Amino acid sequence: MLNSVPEDDAPAPARSRMPPEERRRQLVGIGLGLLRERPLDAITVDEVARRAGISRGLLFHYFASKQAFHREVAAAGLRRLHRAMWPADERPADERLRGAIDGYLAFVERRPGRVMEMAGGSWSADPELAAILRDARATIADGLLAAADAGRDAPADGPLALLRTQSARAWLAFAEQLALDWVAEPSVEREALVDHLEASFRAATG
């Protein structure tokens, strides 16, 4: 669960000792909370430290730089997207692809600004951050393929397998933009959009 985020004029919480990993999780959680309000590159370490009730210098004890902190926040946000698509409860094989697409769309509905930034914002300006995003997209595309292939034979390697992987990654860029456009201007009912995305993924990947 995200940490509660106080108002800007609220006093900083009293400083308390925490184990290092717990403190890191707290700081990343505050960053995720701020990411609901503003772009990643507009999140300052001073504000994060103030909301955590620690000094700016102590924050840098846990993260080597502001960029390193931003990367941790971005990676945590992408893990949340992954959990939204593939929750812990295992779905029946024939429902996995649709369930993952539905979870993706729900994530976009809740956080359109974050997804828009992932699609073409400051995340692509930092090479290391861009690599984190690229790896996350590849993992999502592979997961969608596995969901589509559940219960049926599919090529595991060779040119056709590579083409299907490339198609899944290209489809993800298409779905990203379509979902953002739909959130901004709903053109069809939500279920119809999920139907369309599922059908287009199966058509693209064979």
Sequence positions of predicted segments:
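N-terminal intrinsically disordered/low-complexity leader segments
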Residues: M1-E22
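Short helix-capping/turn signature of helix-turn-helix
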Residues: F63, G120-A125
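Short, hydrophobic secondary-structure boundary micro-motifs
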Residues: M116-A119, E191
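Amphipathic alpha-helical linker/stalk segments
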Residues: A14-R15, E37, V73-A100, L144
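Helix-turn-helix
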Residues: Q26, I30, L34-A68, E72
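Amphipathic alpha-helical packing segments from all-alpha helical-bundle domains
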Residues: H82, F107, P127-D153, L162-A173, ...
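Hydrophobic alpha-helical connector segments
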Residues: E72, W86-G113, A154-A161, S167-W171, ...
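Pre-recognition alpha-helix immediately N-terminal to the DNA-recognition helix
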Residues: R25-L34, R80, G99, G103
